[in-house]
Regions:
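Long, polar/charge-rich, low-hydrophobicity segments
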Residues: 359, 524-528, 532, 540-549, ...
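Short linear capping/connector segments at secondary-structure termini
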Residues: 300-306, 388-394, 529-539, 592-598
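Replace the tail clause
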Residues: 1-491, 495-498
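Active-site-proximal alpha-helical segments within enzyme catalytic domains
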Residues: 322-325, 491, 552-555, 623-626
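Primarily a tetratricopeptide repeat
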Residues: 276, 280, 345, 349, ...
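Helix-capping and short linker residues that terminate individual alpha-solenoid repeat units
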Residues: 215, 287-291, 334, 359, ...
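Long, K/E/R/D-enriched contiguous segments that form extended
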Residues: 483-486, 491-568
Length: 627
């Protein structure tokens, strides 16, 4: 028996010829939705023109390929025929890959935070045909949850407001757009005068503030969800090494007769505090479930404050920054609580993971689907790096979060034998019920391993790694993002130098060369442009984004492949001194319907316009937390 047509269920038929238009898109995230019954369109003028011609609002859905909750909402709602038919009848639906269009993501994240008080992915935004937002949220479940309406309830309320209270909807969209525009700074940030030393008191104050926010019990800062604070750790390590080059010499020699490097007691105190905070966080993360103890690499964040339940996607930008932080800790010399040798092992394993799991060889494209299982060592032929590994693994046709990484006590005993299996389960905090799900727990010691524990782990680790390679693997998003790749180039170059591994420097050089050959667009009559993404060796989309332009040349210069400004190409030059000062957050040629994200207007206005249009309140969630 055929499924009834939309008109049979009281929906108007969508316009003739309307269909899902994502199959030919290069973005892996967009192609994940190409089989949905929703008539998705890529972001662009044509989709907005279609909404204007039909006199319907736009449903804008923004996410990324590795996002677990994006997969959940896709399965629950976008694969559902009833939900799709309602969307097709009453909206023009647009899909955006936030990693390809961070400018679009930033505009509508500002609106989403203003309206709902939360942000995350999947992002669900309702727009006028001219692109102005009037309602927004993140994940919507198929059935109502406490404090959160169902997706169908939201669609029906938006459609009812559009048809019955159009004037209020348009007025509120205008209020939001003007509020966001008014919250923007009058001009781009510009620092007057030449760069100089930072004020020592300001740096010491920052260390003190971080000390007040530190989670001393578990390492890191703040509570759950907890993200690895790479930039904060970089600052703390640098401050521990040299608190400030503007700090005045001590008035008198140190009473203990030690060489203080010209620092006074306050400088020494904050330097010590910075070192201790960084060491506690680095140790906690590397011994936790956030870090893949078998293959290396860090998950994007932990759902819990103690780092024990990771959100399993692995992002290039996170791992590039964390690799460099661990390398810099090694260079600093470590502490007795977190020795440099232990950090060097984490750094080496992470560098190997970057090349083995995210590495892309020249002129090849693996078959669509999961990434190849990790090899025993890095691929020395890597010329570029993929952007991420998925949080989910598809097992028997079903998305299961973290399934590749989970173990049970019984599974360990079957693989290693009763004695070793039980010992590893105890050492690595594997129990039933699992810490993540009924499927088990990720391996993590939670403390420094030494003596017999370290010997046991070194003995069984190859066997465990081999067994895991034979499991289904998470998918890989193979687009190359220039800015993230630049971060990885810098990290690999530093790792190669500090860890005495020249093959990592060689890999950094090859990847830097790829960025120059594929992503850089020189211009004879002015500054060139760095294209943000490439697929299969072809750069596409937009260029000139602030998140891309500083990172890639910095990484290439660090790799020693392109020191400073190379003669003849001028490749990094436009990024160091923007004309008229400052930097732009979006591409000059980007077609945006809104303002770049800076800050959000007060939520009171959002509450008022939700009331005036009788839309469901977009309350902050209790669970789940969007990606």
């Amino acid at each position: 028996m055929r499924d009834p047509e939309p008109a049979d269920r009281g929906f108007p038929n969508p316009p003739s010829g309307a269909s899902n238009a994502l199959a030919a898109e290069p973005s892996a995230y967009l192609r994940q939705h190409a089989g949905n019954p929703v008539h998705w369109q890529p972001f662009g003028d044509a989709a907005f023109a279609a909404a204007a011609a039909r006199d319907v609002p736009v449903f804008l859905s923004i996410g990324y390929a590795a996002c677990h909750w994006c997969h959940v909402m896709a399965h629950e709602s976008f694969e559902d025929r009833d939900a799709a038919d309602y969307l097709n009848a009453h909206f023009v639906s647009i899909k955006v890959d936030r990693e390809e269009r961070p400018d679009v993501d930033a505009v509508y994240m500002t609106a989403t935070q203003a309206i709902s008080g939360e942000g995350g992915w999947p992002m669900s935004v309702f727009l006028l045909p001219d692109g102005r937002a009037f309602h927004a949220g993140t994940y919507y479940p198929p059935r109502p949850m406490p404090g959160r309406p169902s997706f169908r309830q939201v669609l029906e309320a938006v459609n009812e407001a559009w048809t019955e209270r159009r004037g209020a909807v348009e007025a509120n969209a205008d209020t939001l757009a003007r509020g966001i525009a008014a919250s923007q700074p009058a001009a781009a940030l510009h620092l007057d005068g030449p760069p100089g030393a930072l004020d020592a008191a300001l740096l010491a104050e920052a260390v003190t503030a971080l000390s007040g926010a530190e989670d001393r019990a578990h390492g890191g800062f703040g509570g759950a969800p907890k993200f690895p604070p790479a930039a904060v750790l970089e600052f703390l390590i640098r401050h521990a090494a040299v608190p400030s080059d503007s700090m005045p010499p001590a008035a008198a020699p140190d009473t203990a007769g030690q060489d203080t490097g010209g620092l006074d007691s306050a400088g020494l105190e904050t330097a010590t505090a910075a070192r201790d905070m960084a060491g506690r966080c680095l140790a906690a993360m590397s011994r936790s479930a956030l870090f893949d103890q078998l293959d290396g690499g860090f998950a994007r964040y932990s759902v819990t404050a103690d780092w024990s339940v990771p959100h399993f996607e692995k992002m290039l930008y996170d791992n590039a920054q964390l690799l460099r932080v661990y390398v810099h800790w090694v260079r600093l010399g470590g502490t007795p609580e977190y020795p440099a040798a232990e950090a060097a092992g984490i750094a080496g394993l992470t560098a190997d993971w970057l090349l083995a799991r995210l590495g892309l060889a020249p002129a090849t494209r693996p078959a669509p689907g999961p990434a190849p299982a990790p090899a025993a060592g890095p691929d020395t032929g890597v010329v570029a790096l993929a952007s991420s590994l998925d949080a989910d693994t598809v097992v028997d046709g079903v998305h299961a979060e973290g399934a590749s990484y989970l173990w049970t006590p019984g599974g360990l005993e079957s693989l290693l034998g009763t004695a070793d299996g039980a010992a590893v389960a105890a050492l690595m905090n594997v129990r039933m019920p699992g810490s993540v799900s009924a499927h088990g727990s990720p391996l993590h010691p939670g403390r420094e391993m030494s003596g017999g524990d370290a010997a046991l782990w070194q003995r069984v680790r190859p066997q465990l790694a081999h067994a895991r390679r034979n499991r289904p693997q998470p998918g890989r998003d193979e687009k190359v993002v220039a800015g993230w790749t630049g971060l990885a180039v810098a990290a690999l170059a530093d790792a190669g130098a500090v860890l005495a591994r020249p093959e990592l420097v060689a890999a950094a050089e090859r990847i830097a060369d790829y960025l120059e050959r594929v992503h850089w667009r020189p211009a004879a009559d002015g500054p060139g442009r760095l294209m943000r993404v490439s697929h299969e060796g072809v750069a596409r989309g937009i260029g000139g984004l602030l998140g891309t332009t500083p990172c890639a040349p910095k990484g290439c210069s660090r790799s020693m492949r392109l020191p400073g400004t190379p003669a003849g190409t001028g490749w990094p030059r436009p990024f160091w001194t923007p004309p008229a000062g400052g930097s732009r957050p979006t591409a000059a040629s980007g077609t945006l319907r809104g303002s770049p994200r800076r800050s959000r207007p007060p939520r009171a206005a959002a509450t008022a316009w939700n009331r005036s249009t009788a839309l469901p309140p977009a309350a902050p969630p209790r669970w789940p937390v969007p990606c």
